[in-house]
Amino acid sequence: MKKTTTSKPLQFILAVLAFIVYPFGLYKVWKKDFRPLWIRWTYTILGLPFSLLILAFAGLTIFASFLPELDRSIGVRSDRTIVNSADRYSVTFLKTSRETNGAYEEVKVDLEPGGGNLWHYHTAFVEKFHVIDGELTVGMEGKPVKVTTGNDTIAQKGLMHKFYNTSAKPVSFFVRIEPARSFEKTIRSGYGLMNSGQSTPDGMPKNPWHLFLILGYSDSYLEGVPGFIQEPLIHALSKIAQWKGFDKDFDPFCR
């Protein structure tokens, strides 16, 4: 009698189910008598928490899909310059999203020696740097790029980057965001938390819901977590944070 074989697509589906539905996977692993024995015991011990994480991830993203989109609006502010006390620089808004009808935002940054920000990337806008005075170091995918007076560099969408000042003198530079994507609300919210004692000394919000909102407003993501996990997760958690009312904590800084 000819032995029947399982098609490759069906094998793939069964493998996915084994990871997502723990009881199904447990049954298949022990029924098939996988060798060596440590494979079965490894799945038995680690499969449950892994399966629960996948189900929680799916549950969060599905729940958030029914929630309203983020409110990226900001009030009319008279203060054009704000200070980042943790990272040692100030930002002056030259052109806001309201003033350009969402086409771009432009700021002037004055960065002290030793100041800078963390590795991150954006999925919704391009970030253009133009140095006015001094020397700026822009990290691009792990490699430092020195930008001197009168010169430019660009961080494209999806490019991991950061800026910092390794020189002994302050550096001043323009940053242009195209298109404008709640950049002003992101900056005002983040700096507001720092200056009101609601962030750690290295600038991270003490309340994780605040962090999810700040990242969500500008579609920005940090290093260390793969994009296919981080991007839908931040999108979902930022909407849940708004649903829980944590966005109201930013009103003193943005309204």
Show the residue positions of the predicted features.
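Membrane-interface alpha-helices
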Residues: K3, F24-F50
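Membrane-interfacial loop-to-transmembrane-helix junctions in polytopic alpha-helical membrane proteins
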Residues: K3-I13, R35-W38, L118
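Hydrophobic, aromatic-rich membrane-embedded alpha-helical segments
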Residues: K8-W30
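Alpha-helical transmembrane spans of integral membrane proteins, capturing the lipid-embedded, hydrophobic core
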Residues: V16-F19, L48-L53
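Jelly-roll (double-stranded beta-helix
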Residues: I54-Y89, F93-Y104, G116-W119, T123-F125, ...
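Short amphipathic
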Residues: V107-D110
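Structured binding elements
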Residues: F129
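A cytosolic small-molecule/anion-sensing beta-strand core signal
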Residues: I132-D133
